[in-house]
Amino acid sequence: MDSQRNILLIALALVSFLLFQQWQVAKNPAPQAVEQAQSSSTLPAPSFADELDPVPGQQQASAKTITVTTDVLTLSIDTVGGDVVHADLNKYSAELDSSDPFVLLKDTKGHQFIAQSGLVGPQGIDLSSTNRPHYKVSADSFTLADGQDELRVPMTFTANGIEYIKTYVFKRGSYALNVEYDVVNNSGNNATFGMYAHLRQNLMDAGGSITMPTYRGGAYSTEDVRYKKYSFEDMQDRNLSINLADGQGWAAMIQHYFAAAWIPRNEPGTNLYTRVIGNLGDIGVRMPNKTIATGDQAKFEATLWVGPKLQNEMAAVAENLDLVVDYGWLWFIAKPLHSLLAFIQSFVGNWGVAIICLTFIVRGAMYPLTKAQYTSMAKMRMLQPKLQAMRERIGDDRQRMSQEMMELYKKEKVNPLGGCLPLILQMPIFIALYWALMESVELRHSPFFGWIHDLSAQDPYYILPLLMGASMFLIQKMSPTTVTDPMQQKIMTFMPVMFTFFFLFFPSGLVLYWLVSNIVTLIQQTLIYKALEKKGLHTK
């Protein structure tokens, strides 16, 4: 067995797997969850799609929008319906070195991504897209002042003796805002309403590149399904309708690094739904009806998250909301790695330096496996003369050859898989760390030093990938091999070139990790080889 060749093949398979997995995330989201059985709740919310116009008309023209500015958000709210039609993330720039903020929500001719909410039911005021309430406001703009921790933006509407107060509540430093309806019924009759809240976005392709495709689409959580993607293709195939028996869950539209989500206020019987209107897709929640007696009042409320995928903050807003940071099937490894990376960054103050420190920690922890790998390779190499003599003596009798080889391995106390098994055991860590780096919004537009101004983007001058390829070439040259077949030798020589090509388009933060990992490998390899030589295990 040529362990060096197998290690390189495993490494190539690892990169190919990562690329394929990225492509799968973007192009083929996981199959939809099986809907839960209907709750035994006596007042489940109806499917929202059943309450609207069969053929919705054009959204009625806005009378005006108001602007709300906090320390982290700048929102535009339409006074017709009270929807959030624009959202700037003040602490995140649209492009590197740009003064323009990143726009998450917007309503333009070419693209729509908005957060809508309203009241439906028998006396609903938001049943028709062409006849929504015109709210009155006290000002055209509202600002969270210095020293102020909370900002309330009330909007009022009165019809048929019923007063509606829709209030947006903002907290300092928070991307979560509350939407509250206070309804006062002075109509002389009972009135029944239920609140809905959904996100609407153009149906579109996932986008991204071959090495960094990104998922853009719906996602949700219920009491039975912690996290599930529901793509635009899924929405077009079938409308989702799930009854939340205990009212816990959320509905979101997600994309790389950012997300918007509606979280109901734990009202049993809430309906989680999707629907498609032309080229627009909705995902949201419809809460159960409440009947308000004349002379009485009631409150309806939900929480809207609109911002970056910040795990700790999202976890505090809603259970499982932090899972929109999708680490894949190795999340239980990737999440602690990300936490460790963030912990290191809090001390060193630079994400690139934190990646270097994390690499040394990970490779240090895996040193026993690395040592076992090289020791096994050295033992196998010393057996090569005996194995060659065995082949010449036995000839084409494969069964006998296999039997005598195993006896030789047992006698010499050598594991034939020892050179590959440690690397295979390390693969989950490599894959998990890959996803931890790919999914971290903290790395977006984060500089390292010199020419690396954005660890989430590819190296503009390809210096890191070239250094990574050179380090891989050095590892290959320093590693002894028994390969004599010319074709296999060419393949092994070409592999650093192939890896370099792949990494030209990878985020520089990931390439930095791989480069430092290779440097650590060179150091460990040198030290281990010297120790093995002292023990009489020849490495060449």
Curated annotation (Swiss-Prot):
Keyword tags: Cell inner membrane, Cell membrane, Chaperone, Membrane, Protein transport, Transmembrane, Transmembrane helix, Transport
GO MF annotations in UniProt: membrane insertase activity
Membrane topology: Multi-pass membrane protein
NCBIfam families: PRK01318.1-1, PRK01318.1-3, yidC_nterm, yidC_oxa1_cterm
GO annotation (BP), single: protein insertion into membrane
Pfam family, one: 60KD_IMP
Taxonomic classification: Bacteria, Pseudomonadati, Pseudomonadota, Gammaproteobacteria, Vibrionales
InterPro entries named in the record: Membr_insert_YidC, Membr_insert_YidC_N, YidC/ALB3/OXA1/COX18, YidC/Oxa/ALB_C, YidC_ALB_C, YidC_periplasmic_sf
Source organism of the structure: Vibrio campbellii (strain ATCC BAA-1116)
Subunit structure: Interacts with the Sec translocase complex via SecD. Specifically interacts with transmembrane segments of nascent integral membrane proteins during membrane integration.
Entry's transmembrane regions: 6-26, 342-362, 417-437, 455-475, 496-516
Functional note: Required for the insertion and/or proper folding and/or complex formation of integral membrane proteins into the membrane. Involved in integration of membrane proteins that insert both dependently and independently of the Sec translocase complex, as well as at least some lipoproteins. Aids folding of multispanning membrane proteins.
Family: Belongs to the OXA1/ALB3/YidC family. Type 1 subfamily.
Chain positions covered by the region annotation Disordered: 36-63
One Gene Ontology cellular component: plasma membrane
Official protein name in the record: Membrane protein insertase YidC
Keyword Ribosomal protein among UniProt keywords: no
Cellular localisation: Cell inner membrane
